[in-house]
């Protein structure tokens, strides 16, 4: 079942994978069953009903300081929910994002049979009795009747009034500062006036230009619909695409005066607008709608009329009421005594952009935007604030579609993979050229944060080149705190398996074989995929990593980790209920002896015992909660001082390695199973045995 925006649906039929960002489910509050308020959150339990008469039990979660109050008969639109389950034949849903249903503008011609168009203009209560046989049609009729009673707030009425005012005042506005607007802009009316129904008149261009010009930071979803002006410079233009309904569309990326970027998508008169827009030029975009696309905003030009007005054309024919200022995008570029007209500024910036596209290094514009002059490691990409950079990395995963190519790349600088998204035209050029495990140069890519994750994407300056030095990367599991190593394919690198040095401890019932770190690494690298093996080693604990997360949450039911939702509420998918989780420690550190060092993961029981050994006042069962409280209260220094007492502390470690395969790569993870206090007597016997072994080897040689 395909969802449509504003449609009425039975929640138990909704597949989470089909719940897209732009689609919303309409529900009506039938009864308020209870509510709970904490310091920062408010939880309201309601019995709701949809347009088909199906009931659901919904838990609403909202900020306590927003003063939002749900009441009976309120109509809300569910925009995002975390899960749903059945309880007493009712669907139970945890809703995290919603809005009150506000409807005063409907387009019956475009509304589908089970779809209503709901916009943020005026709150309208839809009574349950109004929703009968066909909920969509009844809602449409009700809203139409309601609009007649509230005609002063109707968007259609406002548009009609605006048209009438334009006609009445058209003669007075024909001439501004000696220029005849209708004559001056008749040459661009054909390429900038799109759509079937006219909301804007080219003769009233001065009215349009007087609309508020917003920056990207000022854009809000549902506000100023069709009634604002956005000024931007086109920095990227995609190819045209065709969707399943055989309609064309394309998108661009534009920069505002603060160098922020936003995507603009165009769905009407695609061929004309595609020819109008040129990369590197400034335009006024009038009549767009701000939409939420995943975690980013975009301007969508699909419903209603819109106009694209080249700013270069305006500077030649129109004296703008506001004084034109030099573009802020030039940073410290010296303009001198040159003309401050927009025409000259566009020519200058277009020339600079062209130099950057041709790869010249004297690109001031790009340098002011933190252009990278050398190839960075992935670990540097994750930390840098540079916007443009280059990377040499190995491709470990490829996902290709008609619209883009999505890669995962890695190198030996850290344990994290980096996502790369390649859009047209590089997408078409490299669609069949990437190979798993090969190394490539990704030159002049744009660094962006998407879903709290660092990614790279291409623009018009980006290029890709296959590296001449192909290397093999052995990846050690990131979750268990270990490293990566790259080996040149062209070299003669190999692993030498040395004779095992061991000592059997006959003083205890348990027979132990002690190994060195070097021996453990050798056996791990020579092992087969799927193999596990345990070792005992005398070693020092060094460098517990404070930069990594030190704890996680688990449910008592099956010991599975749980997700932390907004506020302090936790929901276990196994129990299907809200829980009070347990806090467990997970420490990443290094174990070292005289032969080498390996990174290890130390989980809750062993980590808690270490903390208890340093400070006996911290009970083993309370160590996780103690660390969590210190971090949340900004007392990381206490934890840092606590861990510093463990630096180079000597223990007997039981260590397990596991050889895995992930994405056609070899992964070796080391985990600490047991930690014991050092035994000087037993270690002395082990060292004596090791010394005898070395002496015998030297005599034989």
From Swiss-Prot:
Changing residue 403 to A: Reduced single-stranded telomeric DNA binding. One of its GO terms (cellular component) is telomerase holoenzyme complex. Changing residue 590 to A: Does not affect single-stranded telomeric DNA binding; abolished telomerase activity of the holoenzyme telomerase ribonucleoprotein complex. Keywords: Chromosome, DNA-binding, Metal-binding, Telomere, Zinc, Zinc-finger. The keyword Metal-binding applies. Residues 229-301 bind DNA. Coiled coil: none annotated. Changing residue 408 to A: Does not affect single-stranded telomeric DNA binding. Its main location: nucleus. Changing residue 648 to A: Does not affect single-stranded telomeric DNA binding; abolished telomerase activity of the holoenzyme telomerase ribonucleoprotein complex. Zn(2+) binds at residues 555, 572, 575. Changing residue 532 to A: Reduced single-stranded telomeric DNA binding. GO terms for molecular function: single-stranded telomeric DNA binding; zinc ion binding. Changing residue 554 to A: Reduced single-stranded telomeric DNA binding. InterPro entries: Euk_RPA1_DBD_C, NA-bd_OB-fold, Rep_factor-A_C. A zinc finger (C4-type) spans 555-575. Changing residue 293 to A: Abolished single-stranded telomeric DNA binding; does not affect telomerase activity of the holoenzyme telomerase ribonucleoprotein complex. Changing residue 419 to A: Reduced single-stranded telomeric DNA binding. Pfam families: Rep_fac-A_C. One of its GO terms (biological process) is telomere maintenance via telomerase. Changing residue 406 to A: Reduced single-stranded telomeric DNA binding. Single-stranded DNA (ssDNA)-binding protein that mediates the recruitment of telomerase to telomeric DNA. Telomerase is an essential ribonucleoprotein (RNP) enzyme that copies new telomeric repeats onto chromosome ends by repetitively synthesizing the short telomere-repeat sequence 5'-TTGGGG-3' using an RNA template component TER. Belongs to the replication factor A protein 1 family. Component of the telomerase holoenzyme complex, composed of the catalytic core (the catalytic subunit TERT, the telomerase RNA template component TER and TAP65/p65), which is associated with two heterotrimeric subcomplexes: (i) the replication protein A (RPA)-related subcomplex, composed of TEB1, RPA2/TEB2 and RPA3/TEB3 and (ii) the CST-like subcomplex, composed of TAP75/p75, TAP45/p45 and TAP19/p19. TEB1 and the CST-like subcomplex are tethered to the catalytic core by TAP50/p50. This is Telomeric repeat-binding subunit 1. It comes from Tetrahymena thermophila (strain SB210). The gene is TEB1.
């Amino acid at each position: 079942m395909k969802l449509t925006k504003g449609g009425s649906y039975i929640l138990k039929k909704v597949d989470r994978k089909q719940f897209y960002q732009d689609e919303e489910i309409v529900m009506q509050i039938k009864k308020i069953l209870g509510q709970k308020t904490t310091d920062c959150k408010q939880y309201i339990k309601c019995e709701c009903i949809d347009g088909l008469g199906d009931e659901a039990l919904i838990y609403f979660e909202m900020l306590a300081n927003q003063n939002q109050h749900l009441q009976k008969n309120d109509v809300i639109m569910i925009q995002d929910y975390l899960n749903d389950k059945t309880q007493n034949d009712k669907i139970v849903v945890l809703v995290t994002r919603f809005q009150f249903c506000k409807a005063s503008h409907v387009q019956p011609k475009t509304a589908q049979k089970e779809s209503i168009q709901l916009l943020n203009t005026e709150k309208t209560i839809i009574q349950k009795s109004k929703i009968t046989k066909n909920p969509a049609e009844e809602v449409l009729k009700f809203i139409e009747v309601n609009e007649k009673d509230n005609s002063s707030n109707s968007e259609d009425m406002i548009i009609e009034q605006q048209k009438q005012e334009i006609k009445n005042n058209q003669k007075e506005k024909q001439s501004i500062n000696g220029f005849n607007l209708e004559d001056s802009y008749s040459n661009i009316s054909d390429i900038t006036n799109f759509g079937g129904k006219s909301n804007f008149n080219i003769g009233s261009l001065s009215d349009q230009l007087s609309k508020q010009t917003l920056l990207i930071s000022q854009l809000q979803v549902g506000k100023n619909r069709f009634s604002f002006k956005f000024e931007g410079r086109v920095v990227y233009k995609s190819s045209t695409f065709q969707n399943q309904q055989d309609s064309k569309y394309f998108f661009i990326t534009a920069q505002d005066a603060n160098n922020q970027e936003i995507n603009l998508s165009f769905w009407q008169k695609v061929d004309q607008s595609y020819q109008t827009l040129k990369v590197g030029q400034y335009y006024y975009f009038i009549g767009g709608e701000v939409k939420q696309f995943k975690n980013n905003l975009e301007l969508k030009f699909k419903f209603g009329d819109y106009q694209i007005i080249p700013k270069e054309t305006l500077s030649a024919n129109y004296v703008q009421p506001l004084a034109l200022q030099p573009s802020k995008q030039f940073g410290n570029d010296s303009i001198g005594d040159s003309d401050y007209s927009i025409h000259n500024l566009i020519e200058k910036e277009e020339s600079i952009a062209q130099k950057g596209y041709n790869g010249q290094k004297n690109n001031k514009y790009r340098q002011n935007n933190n252009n990278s002059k050398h190839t960075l490691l992935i670990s540097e990409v994750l930390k840098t604030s540079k916007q443009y950079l280059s990377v040499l990395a190995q491709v470990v995963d490829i996902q290709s579609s008609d619209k883009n190519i999505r890669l995962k790349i890695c190198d030996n600088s850290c344990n994290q993979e980096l996502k790369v998204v390649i859009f047209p035209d590089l997408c078409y050029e490299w669609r069949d050229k990437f190979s798993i495990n090969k190394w490539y140069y990704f030159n002049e890519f744009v660094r962006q944060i998407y879903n709290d994750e660092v990614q790279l994407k291409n623009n018009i300056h980006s290029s890709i080149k296959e590296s001449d030095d192909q290397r093999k990367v052995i990846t050690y599991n990131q979750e268990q705190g270990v490293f990566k190593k790259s080996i040149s394919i062209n070299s003669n690198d190999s692993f030498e398996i040395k004779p095992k040095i061991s000592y059997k401890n006959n003083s205890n019932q348990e027979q132990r074989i002690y190994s060195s770190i070097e021996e453990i690494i050798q056996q791990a690298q020579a092992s087969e995929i799927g193999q596990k093996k345990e070792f005992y080693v005398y070693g020092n604990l060094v460098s517990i990593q404070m930069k990594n997360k030190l704890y996680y949450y688990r449910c008592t039911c099956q010991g599975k980790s749980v997700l932390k939702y907004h506020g302090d509420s936790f929901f276990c998918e196994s129990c299907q209920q809200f829980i009070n989780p347990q806090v467990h420690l997970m420490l990443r550190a290094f174990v070292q002896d005289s032969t080498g060092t390996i990174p290890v993961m130390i989980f809750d029981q062993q980590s808690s015992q270490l903390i208890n050994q340093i400070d006996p006042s911290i009970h083993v069962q309370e160590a996780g909660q103690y660390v969590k409280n210190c971090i949340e209260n900004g007392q990381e220094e206490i934890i840092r001082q606590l861990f510093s007492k463990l630096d180079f502390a000597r223990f007997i470690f039981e260590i397990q390695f596991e050889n895995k395969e992930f994405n056609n790569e070899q992964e070796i993870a080391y985990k600490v199973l047991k930690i014991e206090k050092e035994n000087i007597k037993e270690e002395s016997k082990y060292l004596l045995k090791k010394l005898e072994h070395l002496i015998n080897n030297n005599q034989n040689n």
